[in-house]
Amino acid sequence: MDLVNDLILRAARGEPTPRPPVWFMRQAGRYQKAYRKLRERYTLPEIVQNPEVCAEVTLLPVKALGVDAAILFADITTPLYGMGVDLSLVENKGPVIHNPVRDEKGVEALRPLVPEEAVPFVLETIRILKRELPVPLIGFAGAPFTLASYLVEGGPSRRFLRVKALMYGEEALWHRLMEKLTEAMARYLRAQAEAGADLLQVFDSWVGALSPADYRRYVKPHMERLFQSLRPAGVPVIHFGVGTMGLLEDMKEAGGDVLGLDHHTPLPWARALLGATPVQGNLDPAVLLAPKGVIRREVQRILKENGGKSGHIFNLGHGIVPETPEENVRYVVELIQEVAA
């Protein structure tokens, strides 16, 4: 289907738009009644590996909310299966790695990712969506540090002690792990673009655990290589992290056409720091649990803080939480659409 709404593509290029485009991280998920109904029939891996069902889930918020972009429904750990990682997605916990990568043997056991063989269902989902979507489709992948955190820790972590111990204690091995993950995610993202994704987002959900000095030494060179390898894909790339206020300048230097801001980052400060670089964000997801008067106030605050500058994609500072009322998400979209009314 030909795009009838290219607002997000124009904003990602820093071009003027009549209003900010709006979409939400985790816009297809447990807060939706229709999604919960599907989950009664399918597990998360079953949805992701069934292109027809996965396309249906990806389309849910486009139809229900009127957002300006769809984001491929998947998990950031999806490509790890194709690298030989034994993992499970545990409800209310997240990915659990049954063969954690903590030594040279574990790193060398990671296979090169061949997306067409390892995740053909992801690419077929994209092709289906491109026939049906009136708005751009965002493909995505986890950033190397965030994926390394899962692999080394064995699952979600709060203190990241194991991953930091490897990083500090065996630096050469750490860089080898990051090189493997960088190459794998570059292939994965390029394959998504070739299948039809209009934009890409790199999620570095846990990189805020690092100091700026550690980011520069242990992560930034790999992110630079990742973004350089994505240039031939010819689509805009969003670079997003959580807890990254102190890393934003380095993240900008590492690459990406758009910088995603979490809700702890003051928007005026970020825009001054980043100059002409387009930004995405950054409403606190918890605001969507509040009364509509508060939601309106906070949405208007963010729009005012942006000051009408080009290159602003409205989003949350993190993903929609499951407790969120659907009507409140729809209300945010309506508020943004009022800007151009």
UniProtKB/Swiss-Prot annotation:
Protein's pathway: Porphyrin-containing compound metabolism; protoporphyrin-IX biosynthesis; coproporphyrinogen-III from 5-aminolevulinate: step 4/4
Marked site positions, Transition state stabilizer:
75
Q: Superkingdom, according to UniProt?
A: Bacteria
What is its subcellular localisation?
Cytoplasm
**Listed GO cellular component terms?**
cytosol
**Per UniProt, where does substrate bind?**
26-30, 75, 150, 205, 318
- Which keywords describe this protein according to UniProt? Cytoplasm, Decarboxylase, Lyase, Porphyrin biosynthesis
**InterPro entries recorded for this chain?**
UROD/MetE-like_sf (IPR038071), Uroporphyrinogen_deCO2ase_HemE (IPR006361), Uroporphyrinogen_deCOase (IPR000257)
Q: What does this protein do?
A: Catalyzes the decarboxylation of four acetate groups of uroporphyrinogen-III to yield coproporphyrinogen-III.
Q: What is catalyzed by this enzyme?
A: uroporphyrinogen III + 4 H(+) = coproporphyrinogen III + 4 CO2
NCBIfam families documented for this protein: hemE
The record's principal subcellular location, in a coarse class, is: cytoplasm
User: What gene is this protein a product of?
Assistant: hemE
Lineage in the entry? Answer: Bacteria, Thermotogati, Deinococcota, Deinococci, Thermales
Q: What class of enzyme is it?
A: lyase
Q: Would you tell me the protein name for this molecule?
A: Uroporphyrinogen decarboxylase
Tell me the protein family, please. Belongs to the uroporphyrinogen decarboxylase family.
Which GO molecular function annotation, any one, does this entry have?
uroporphyrinogen decarboxylase activity
Gene3D superfamilies listed in its UniProt record: 3.20.20.210
Identify the HAMAP family for this entry: URO_D
Q: Which GO terms describe its biological process?
A: protoporphyrinogen IX biosynthetic process
EC numbers listed for it are: 4.1.1.37
Q: How does it assemble?
A: Homodimer.
